Amino acid sequence: MELRDRIAGLMGQARAELAELVAIRSVADPRQFPPSECARAARWVLDHFAQVGFTDLRLEETADGSQAVYGARPGPDPAAPTVLLYAHYDVQPPLDDHAWRTPPFQLTEVDGRWYGRGAADCKGNILMHLTALRALGDQVPVNLKLIVEGSEEQGTGGLEDYVPRHADQLRADAILVCDTGNAAVGVPAVTVSLRGLANVVVSVEALSSEVHSGMYSGPAPDALAALIHLLATLRDRAGNTTVTGLDNTQTWDGVPWPPEQFRTDACLLPGVSLLGDGTVSDMVWARPAVTVLGIDCPPVVGSAAAIQPHARARLNLRVPPGMDPVEAQDALVAHLEAAAPWGCGSRSSENPPASRSRPGPAGPPTPRSPPPCMTRSAGR
C-alpha cells in the first residue's frame, strides 16, 4: 500500500484521537483550570507515543511545575542521524465560551476543517506526529527523540529552564517543530526562525481606595485612565510600536505577505487600516510588536460611579530574529515605568522570555528551501 493511502486510512483514527485530546482542558494556569487537566493530557501523550514504539518514556517535572513528556525511539542504525520531535499539549484559555462559534473543547468539523481549542496549536501537531509514525511503521531510517511540553502558551519558562540542564538527553541533529503555519492552505512552508517573546504585567496605582466620582472626579487621578494613557505610548498614530530603545525600522527582504491576503488571514473588518509604516512582512517578521492581552478593570455591567484606585494590564512583546528578548523586555519595563502619567506609581512584573530567536538557520541540517519530501507530498 502506498504511503498516501496508508495516511488516508489512518485519518479516522487521527480525528477520533484528536477529539479525545481536545476534550482535555489543558490550560496550564491553575487559577483557571485544575492542574489535573494538564496531568491527563501529559499521560495521554505518553501512552499514545508508547503505542508507536517510543521507550524510556517519562514525565519530567520542569521549573514552573509543568510536566514535559520525554521519550526515545532507536532507529535501525545507531549511527544514523537523530531527529527530535517537538510539540506542546497545553492550550490557551477559551476566554468567553459564548464568543465561540463551536464548543471550544469539542472537536467540530466545519467546511472540511476541524475546530476546537488546540486542534491546530498544538494538539493537532501531536496527532500529526503519531499519524506519520503509524503510516511509516518500521520504515523510519533515523533515531527519534520526543519532547512535548506543558506550559508553552503561558510563557513561564518551564522548558526553557529544562533544556540547558538536559542538553545531552535532548541532543539531536535536527529538531522538528511543527507549531508553525503554512504560506496558505495547501501551500507548505519551512519556518527557519521564530519571533522571540516576553510577557509583562504592568500595574498602575493612584489612590488608596475607590472614591465617588460625583465628589472627586476632575482633580483626582483615575488609575484606569492613567493605564490607558500609558498603553497609548506604546504605539504612534500610524500604529508603529514605539518602545523606547527598540529599533522599529528594520525591513524584511524575504518573500512578502501580500496585504490583501493578510487582511483576509487576520480577519480585518472592512475599512480598518493595517498598522505601521512598513510592509506587512516588515511589521510581522522584522520589527517588535506589543499586544495588550488583558486588562483588569470593572466590567461595564455592574460598574459603579467610582474612580478606580488601581488597574493593570498584561502585555505581550514579540521581537524579531536577532533582537535579544531579555534586553527587549528590560526596555519595555523601563518605558512603562517612565511613561506613567500624573505621578501615578507603575510596577511591572515579568515572565521569563520564552525564546531567543536568531536570524536564519542555525546550522547545515536546517533547509533553506523545502526538502523534496514536502514537494512530493504537496504535489507542487
PLM regions: where:
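N-terminal helical capping/dimerization or prosegment-like subdomains
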Residues: 1-97, 310, 314, 329
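Active-site metal-coordination/substrate-binding segment of hydrolases
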Residues: 80-148, 168
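Histidine/acidic-residue-rich, glycine-tolerant segments that coordinate divalent metal ions
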Residues: 140-222
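A short beta-alpha structural unit
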Residues: 316-320, 346-362
